[in-house]
Amino acid sequence: MDNLGSLTTGLAKVFPQDRLGYAVFQADAVFSSFSYTKFYPEIAAVPAGAKRDALLKTKWVKEIGSWVDAMKPYANTGYYIPYGRDFIKAHTLTTASFAGTGIKEANLADLGAFVDNLQDPNQPLIRAYETQRTTPNPSG
């Protein structure tokens, strides 16, 4: 496997009877910083802060979009991608609690709904990507 990004689709192919689920925040400044800062001079040149976070998020969201598109052909793969929460600027949804992980437009209160769904073979997998962040996330 030359492209580590193909791991998601590779797992879906190798384990077609398994239910796979992926969850990240779009507004990440931790994993995206690790992934892009040293490799993109235009990001490395900007001091840490809001401007750098915006550059990181632009690349991260684009990559998430490609990743989601790659998952779409696989019925055994679900995803849960809320915008973010104001808590350590990370991609992880399970740090400390599920607070602030809801996707309002999909009527999903928090990540717990996705986890429960992932474990229920009688339900189609949730595929939720937040597109309408209407308010800041004060509970995160």
Task: Give the positions of each predicted feature.
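C-terminal His-loop and adjacent cap/lid subdomain of alpha/beta-hydrolase
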Residues: M1-G140
